[in-house]
Swiss-Prot record:
Its cofactor is Mg(2+). It comes from Rhodococcus opacus (strain B4). InterPro entries: 6-PGluconate_DH-like_C_sf (IPR008927), KARI (IPR013023), KARI_C (IPR000506), KARI_N (IPR013116), KARI_prok (IPR014359), NAD(P)-bd_dom_sf (IPR036291). This is Ketol-acid reductoisomerase (NADP(+)). GO terms for molecular function: ketol-acid reductoisomerase activity; magnesium ion binding; NADP binding. Its EC number is 1.1.1.86. Mg(2+) 1 binds at residues 192, 196. Involved in the biosynthesis of branched-chain amino acids (BCAA). Catalyzes an alkyl-migration followed by a ketol-acid reduction of (S)-2-acetolactate (S2AL) to yield (R)-2,3-dihydroxy-isovalerate. In the isomerase reaction, S2AL is rearranged via a Mg-dependent methyl migration to produce 3-hydroxy-3-methyl-2-ketobutyrate (HMKB). In the reductase reaction, this 2-ketoacid undergoes a metal-dependent reduction by NADPH to yield (R)-2,3-dihydroxy-isovalerate. The gene is ilvC.
Amino acid sequence: MAVEMFYDDDADLSIIQGRKVAVIGYGSQGHAHSLSLRDSGVDVRIGLKEGSKSRAKAEEQGLTVGTPAEVSEWADVIMVLAPDTAQASIFTNDIEPNLKDGDALFFGHGLNIHFELIKAPEFVTVGMVAPKGPGHLVRRQFVDGKGVPALIAIDQDPKGEGQALALSYAKAIGGARAGVIKTTFKEETETDLFGEQAVLCGGTEELVKTGFEVMVEAGYAPEMAYFEVLHELKLIVDLMYEGGIARMNYSVSDTAEFGGYLSGPRVIDAGTKERMKAILADIQSGEFTRRLVANVENGNTELEGLRKANAEHPIEVTGKKLRDLMSWVDRPITETA
């Protein structure tokens, strides 16, 4: 099914310019949205809790900062860009008591609305504007006069103005320059979670670790295994990112291409596909979200345990040693502190 696309000429910037926008959070997306909204002539304020390390940064960049409650009371469009696991409590404690008839509540990801962790009053417009790129790229493209494609969705539209408002917001952060895709909260949430879990984060991570283990257990040096299954992954992903799988296969050697065709289906087979379907079913049913919420309610104990086990994998020890040799690699804070 073809998606519905919108561009700059389909969006009226004056709509969002006539509103007061509160952006809750000042992380990767928060700073990109806020600065680009401001540069597009929108009256914007940032909502951050007292003591947040981001307050000084936002103020240094010329933005007005208040608590989430203060800016929610002031605004008539509230964009929630805090972490997923913090949004429900922020909504209950700071946003909901300050909602007024005609307000719009926007999100950068649909999880809390789709799985009803947040239930907005019926008089509030509920929508989503979600650039398909990290915040630094969204901001850089905006400054360069370009844009990152964005998604919009409307979940609740009591005034019949939701789509026009979302398109106006998307235009203000540069999304309509590249193209805006209309979707739903359900589609965005479930596809995003599946991609993260089955392929981008969970699937790729386990594939890399297992490949490393197979090579080391067969007697190869950990350093050689690291280079072959992790370090060179970026080269392949960059080719796929630039021109799809066909571009990657065109660019690698015939030996690599032929071997990939033969061995890839032996690694990712029909059984893998069935397990992926089971992951998708857990997402669709809300089982994953229930487990996510339970983890937060239990003080992140499950997540911390998983993090610890992952950090202790031998590939991490080998990787840190090899990255010390790579002057061109940006080192993470955890390795440079």
